Curated annotation (Swiss-Prot):
Source species: Streptomyces griseus subsp. griseus (strain JCM 4626 / CBS 651.72 / NBRC 13350 / KCC S-0626 / ISP 5235)
Its biological purpose: Catalyzes the formation of 6,7-dimethyl-8-ribityllumazine by condensation of 5-amino-6-(D-ribitylamino)uracil with 3,4-dihydroxy-2-butanone 4-phosphate. This is the penultimate step in the biosynthesis of riboflavin.
Binding site for 5-amino-6-(D-ribitylamino)uracil: 26, 58-60, 81-83, 114
Pfam families: DMRL_synthase
Name under which the protein is recorded: 6,7-dimethyl-8-ribityllumazine synthase
Length: 161
């Protein structure tokens, strides 16, 4: 299981952060779990009014993330699912999404939580979606990582806090 060795992140004083969640629509059951996990994590962190936007698929996540990064968000969470099929499409989409979201983060300085599952099978995706019986909750993890990074960046840019 890939979740072994995950850090326990302590995130405090982040209720005032402006956070957006962007979620793809492919693989509805998996996406419902990822979105629920993300919203639960935000609520646990005291961020009760996040922006939630839906896009057609994972490939559309980077362009929306880039626009949101330029509109004053402190953190963005990108959620999607890409499941391997019988053609190279999986590799192209997975690489494009990964590089695109990384570029948004590096270019803008706004953390983007990477909650895009790239799996060989639907069963692997369901096991990571945070649903009842899942072993992992990648939506929750992506929020925690993005918000923790935003909180860290706040201390770097505002040392008086």
């Amino acid at each position: 299981m890939s979740g072994k060795g995950a850090p326990e992140l302590s995130v405090r004083n982040c209720g005032d952060l402006r956070v957006a969640v962007i979620a793809a629509q492919w693989h509805e059951k998996v996406m419902d779990g990822l979105v629920d996990g993300a919203l639960r994590a935000l609520h646990e962190l005291g961020i009760d009014e996040p922006t939630l936007l839906r896009v057609p698929g994972s490939f559309e996540l980077p362009v929306v993330a880039k626009v949101l990064a330029g509109r004053g968000y402190d953190a963005i969470v990108a959620l999607g699912v890409v499941i391997r099929g019988g053609t190279p499409h999986f590799e192209y989409v997975s690489q494009g999404v990964t590089l695109g979201l990384t570029q948004v983060t590096v270019d803008t300085g706004v953390p983007v939580g990477f909650g895009v599952l790239t799996c060989d099978t639907e069963e692997q995706a369901l096991d990571r979606a945070g649903l009842e019986g899942s072993n992992e909750d990648k939506g929750h993890e992506a929020v925690t990582a993005a918000v923790a990074t935003a909180a860290t960046l706040r201390t770097v840019s505002e040392p008086w806090r």
